[in-house]
Amino acid sequence: MTHQTHAYHMVNPSPWPLTGALSALLMTSGLAMWFHFNSTILLMIGLTTNTLTMYQWWRDVIRESTFQGHHTPTVQKGLRYGMILFIISEVLFFTGFFWAFYHSSLAPTPELGGCWPPTGIHPLNPLEVPLLNTSVLLASGVSITWAHHSLMEGNRYPMLQALFITIALGVYFTLLQASEYYEAPFTISDGVYGSTFFVATGFHGLHVIIGSTFLIVCFFRQLKFHFTSNHHFGFEAAAWYWHFVDVVWLFLYVSIYWWGS
């Protein structure tokens, strides 16, 4: 920062975008190998390289922001715009799944029996595990807001407490979703109902796992005093992402579990 006369961060060459792209290729190819040939070797290599990339990329960003002071207010403003655009792209991603669901359910074809849910499909009761999942995610939305306000007010321990509760609720949601999948009376191959249900809720579940990972990183950073009341964009981005995951679940619950059943 001492050798430049502007507030922007000139990023050093980094291998992580390349290794991230390679891990994405390995994971998608590995999924195809797993589905068609029951081999998980390529998938495991992809997951390993993805985990290593995430760890090292996060480490570099933390070093640049917390220890080298590259994240000036101008840089943080750019990062905020980037996060907003990323969340908008995620909204459009899920819009595709809702479009597929409503396209199939509002005008069911004769092949589906002319009704929704299709003939032979027994949907899950929206007042059982799905309602509990909704309560869990809404509670986590409250606790992440509590953590954010505690951080802005400089209350370190209440922030850690609230963040830990949020992470615990996120993990609990994932376990509930896994048990629901295990006990579901239909599969992803049971026509358009199974496909839209498992792809939409499955991708949401993946986003919950990503969000939980993001929050775990923030928890350990807070333990090491990385955040201050006016310099905590890493946590702020995680909180925005978590609220997005909350809102998507509400739409999923109302559309697929409640109305769709």
From Swiss-Prot:
Component of the cytochrome c oxidase, the last enzyme in the mitochondrial electron transport chain which drives oxidative phosphorylation. The respiratory chain contains 3 multisubunit complexes succinate dehydrogenase (complex II, CII), ubiquinol-cytochrome c oxidoreductase (cytochrome b-c1 complex, complex III, CIII) and cytochrome c oxidase (complex IV, CIV), that cooperate to transfer electrons derived from NADH and succinate to molecular oxygen, creating an electrochemical gradient over the inner membrane that drives transmembrane transport and the ATP synthase. Gene3D superfamilies: 1.10.287.70, Cytochrome c oxidase, subunit III, four-helix bundle. Component of the cytochrome c oxidase (complex IV, CIV), a multisubunit enzyme composed of 14 subunits. The complex is composed of a catalytic core of 3 subunits MT-CO1, MT-CO2 and MT-CO3, encoded in the mitochondrial DNA, and 11 supernumerary subunits COX4I, COX5A, COX5B, COX6A, COX6B, COX6C, COX7A, COX7B, COX7C, COX8 and NDUFA4, which are encoded in the nuclear genome. PROSITE patterns: COX3. Residues 35-40, 106-128, 184-190, 257-261 are mitochondrial intermembrane. It is found in: Mitochondrion inner membrane. The keyword 4Fe-4S does not apply. It is an enzyme of class 7 (translocase). It catalyses: 4 Fe(II)-[cytochrome c] + O2 + 8 H(+)(in) = 4 Fe(III)-[cytochrome c] + 2 H2O + 4 H(+)(out). It comes from Raphicerus campestris. It is a multi-pass membrane protein. This is Cytochrome c oxidase subunit 3. The keyword Membrane applies. One of its GO terms (molecular function) is cytochrome-c oxidase activity. InterPro entries: Cyt_c/ubiquinol_Oxase_su3, Cyt_c_oxase_su3_dom, Cyt_c_oxidase-like_su3, Cyt_c_oxidase_su3-like_sf, Cyt_c_oxidase_su3_a-hlx. The chain crosses the membrane at residues 16-34, 41-66, 73-105, 129-152, 156-183, 191-223, 233-256. The lineage of its organism: Eukaryota, Metazoa, Chordata, Craniata, Vertebrata. Its main location: mitochondrion.
